[in-house]
């Protein structure tokens, strides 16, 4: 009879412990109910990129001296630089410059080592297309500056929505 009583006591302790664990889990669940949602509605709300965000590369044709430093420092030799040597002025003349963003790893080496600062990183990260050949940008496409997420009036940024909720 004595082992039977201790068995009932152990069962009671285990039941109380299980109820305590369930209660703790329920309290954690209730504490999350007061928090703001973490997910964003992507096409309508966008995160503001950080200052050093490495997005699409912007290229300024007039500044480029066709030195090909960007090609040498690129880990995958990606930028295609076509130039012609002008004998009368004894300098290279840039003919064509292109980058295939389907292959680019956005490391930023080309921007960092460019001696004339003709390359820069933008905050544009929406490069999806239906055809991968559309990701090959020439100097004209690389020269276009993207619209800033902050300046776009059709998009509510997460920073603005948080400021509205706190007011």
UniProtKB/Swiss-Prot annotation:
Q: Which residues bind [4Fe-4S] cluster 1?
A: 64, 67, 70, 114
A GO MF annotation of the entry reads:
NADH dehydrogenase (ubiquinone) activity
Against PROSITE patterns, the record matches this protein to:
4FE4S_FER_1 (PS00198), 4FE4S_FER_2 (PS51379)
How does the record classify its membrane topology? Peripheral membrane protein
Q: Which residues are in the 4Fe-4S ferredoxin-type domain? A: 55-84, 95-124
Compartment annotation: Plastid, Chloroplast thylakoid membrane
Instruction: Please name the Pfam families in this protein's record.
Output: Fer4_7
Chain positions recorded as [4Fe-4S] cluster 2 binding sites: 74, 104, 107, 110
| Biological process, per Gene Ontology | photosynthesis, light reaction
Where is this protein primarily located? plastid
Q: Which cofactor does it need?
A: [4Fe-4S] cluster
Superkingdom to which the source organism belongs: Eukaryota
What's noted on cofactor binding?
Binds 2 [4Fe-4S] clusters per subunit.
Q: What is its EC number?
A: 7.1.1.-
| Record field: catalytic activity | a plastoquinone + NADH + (n+1) H(+)(in) = a plastoquinol + NAD(+) + n H(+)(out); a plastoquinone + NADPH + (n+1) H(+)(in) = a plastoquinol + NADP(+) + n H(+)(out)
Q: Which UniProt keywords are listed? A: 4Fe-4S, Chloroplast, Iron, Iron-sulfur, Membrane, Metal-binding, NAD, NADP, Plastid, Plastoquinone, Quinone, Repeat, Thylakoid, Translocase
Q: Name one GO cellular component term.
A: chloroplast thylakoid membrane
State the family it belongs to: Belongs to the complex I 23 kDa subunit family.
Q: How does it assemble?
A: NDH is composed of at least 16 different subunits, 5 of which are encoded in the nucleus.
- State its role: NDH shuttles electrons from NAD(P)H:plastoquinone, via FMN and iron-sulfur (Fe-S) centers, to quinones in the photosynthetic chain and possibly in a chloroplast respiratory chain. The immediate electron acceptor for the enzyme in this species is believed to be plastoquinone. Couples the redox reaction to proton translocation, and thus conserves the redox energy in a proton gradient.
Q: What is this protein called?
A: NAD(P)H-quinone oxidoreductase subunit I, chloroplastic
Source organism of the structure: Gossypium hirsutum
């Amino acid at each position: 009879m004595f082992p039977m009583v201790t068995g009932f006591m152990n069962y009671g302790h285990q039941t109380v412990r299980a109820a305590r664990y369930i209660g703790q889990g329920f309290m954690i669940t209730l504490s999350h109910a007061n928090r703001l949602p973490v997910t964003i509605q992507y096409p309508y709300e966008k995160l503001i990129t950080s200052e050093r965000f490495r997005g699409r590369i912007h290229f300024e044709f007039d500044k480029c001296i066709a030195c090909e430093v960007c090609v040498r420092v690129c880990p995958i030799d990606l930028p295609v630089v076509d130039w012609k040597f002008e004998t009368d002025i004894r300098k290279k003349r840039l003919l064509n410059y292109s980058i295939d963003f389907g292959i680019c790893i956005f490391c930023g080496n080309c921007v960092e080592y460019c001696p004339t600062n003709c390359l820069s990183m933008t905050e544009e990260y929406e490069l999806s297309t239906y055809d991968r050949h559309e990701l090959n940008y020439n100097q004209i496409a690389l020269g276009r500056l993207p619209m800033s997420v902050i300046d776009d009036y059709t998009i509510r940024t997460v920073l603005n929505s948080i400021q509205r909720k706190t007011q």
